[in-house]
Design a protein with these regions (language model features):
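Short, solvent-exposed loop/turn segments at secondary-structure boundaries
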Residues: 43, 125-129
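The catalytic core of metal-dependent phosphodiesterases that act on cyclic dinucleotides
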Residues: 51-124
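Alpha-helix-loop-beta-strand connector modules within alpha/beta enzyme cores
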Residues: 133-136
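Catalytic core of bacterial c-di-GMP phosphodiesterases, primarily the EAL and HD-GYP domains
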Residues: 2-77
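A generic structural signal for residues located within well-ordered alpha-helices
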Residues: 5, 98-101, 129
Length: 136
């Protein structure tokens, strides 16, 4: 069911963007947060690419968000993330620093944006170590 919801949201975003373009409005990218369940199916990349193409939306207008834990946990998901990126979808890694932070994530070559979780910076000035990390 969650995969169907992910696809519904993706299709609705593409449809709205197409309508706004047709109305002459300036549009900005709207990112789609995909569930981990959707990322276990290699066909998801082709399916989403086909939806965007059929509706007439460039893939760079619908960035794909995945959580850091999903990106790091599984080589299969990393491969699918690479395929999204290779098909023109910007890739955002969400929740970086929410207890799962890893330099491995920073070595992922396919992501375009790293969204830092608020919990990583909440107390950044409260300790000398955190302050050093912030200023170096």
């Amino acid at each position: 069911m969650i995969k169907a919801l992910d696809e519904y949201v993706f299709r609705e975003v593409c449809t709205h963007q197409r309508r706004w373009l047709d109305e002459g409005k300036k549009i900005v990218p709207i990112s789609i947060n995909l569930s981990r369940a959707s990322l276990y199916f290699e066909s998801v990349v082709k399916r989403y690419h086909d939806i965007a193409r059929r509706i007439g939306i460039y893939t760079h207008l619908v960035p794909i968000e995945i959580t850091e834990s999903a990106a790091v946990d599984n080589d299969e998901i990393k491969s699918i993330a690479d395929k999204f990126h290779g098909n023109g979808f910007p890739l955002l890694v969400d929740d970086f620093g929410s207890g799962y932070s890893s330099l491995v994530t920073l070595n992922m070559k396919c992501f375009d944006t790293l969204k830092i979780d608020k919990s990583l910076i909440d107390y950044i000035g409260d300790s000398m170590v955190r302050g050093c990390l912030c200023t170096r």
